[in-house]
Amino acid sequence: MEQKIDKKNSYSFGITSSTTVHVLGEVVAIGGILYYTHSQVNQLNTKIASLEKQILDLTNILKHLSPHSFQQLQSSPTTQSTPPLPQSTPQSQQSQQSAVLPQRPSFLGGSTPKESQSFPGVETRSLGEKTTRGKLKSPHPSQIPVTQENFHYPYQTMNKTMRWEFLKPVESDESEDETNCQNGVCTLQKQEKNVTFNGSVEQLKYGNFSPQRSTKTMIGSPSIRPLIPHESIESVSESIESSQDQSFSSRETISGNFKSKDDHQLSESEINQLVSKAIRTKK
């Protein structure tokens, strides 16, 4: 069986039996596991570094948003402050509010809120959104960390918009002669070591007939049995005995004439050599 795989989507992996390979642009998914190419290493490192920075900022925010700090913030206006007089000036109100509100940490900007609040709260700019009353608003969409739920979010890479998705392994069909085709990708029976790929396959049948080109996209184990799906090695030997006067051209199948007295002396290794020679001449 001759394999003709698209060079743009050809990858070499240690593939086991019943494994499905999906080529998604520059991402290869084998058995539901994503393998990234070299061109995406820098982008992944950048995203990881930004996520680590966001985690560090959120950790620092949570340290200042502990329940103990909230109790101090809620108890400070009632114990230390008094209701302002109607005749108080704006400067006195501002000085009183600055005395009640805690000082912001250095990583949050280090300035007090400009507008009055019903009770002291916390403001932050780490996610690009101001928050009051200790509640965080939703961050910008570009700052949302990548998870399994929002993994379909499109992004730009290599000047192309791609969508990533988690793929499940495609189980092969249990029947011997039929194939399981889904979305233009076909797989063979389970007992063979099969790999599905996006390419074309030329299927050669050895005997006193011409090779046939398969229109389906599939690949099987490179052994003698998938090359002769409906006949065994013995039946091929019998067909060679019955057609001892016929010769095969080197471009079609096996070159040379076989005599009936030498057929029983062909070993399995010799048959494999003849098959390999026919495949090389076909290329």
UniProtKB/Swiss-Prot annotation:
Transmembrane segments: 13-35
Compartments, as annotated in UniProt: Membrane
Keyword Coiled coil: yes
Chain segments annotated as coiled-coil in the UniProt record: 37-66
Keywords from the named record: Coiled coil, Membrane, Transmembrane, Transmembrane helix
Membrane topology classification: Single-pass membrane protein
Cellular-component GO terms for this entry: membrane
Designated name of the protein: Uncharacterized protein 056R
UniProt-annotated stretches for the region Disordered: 70-146, 234-269
Presence of the UniProt keyword Cell wall biogenesis/degradation in the record: no
Compositionally biased intervals (Low complexity): 71-98, 234-252
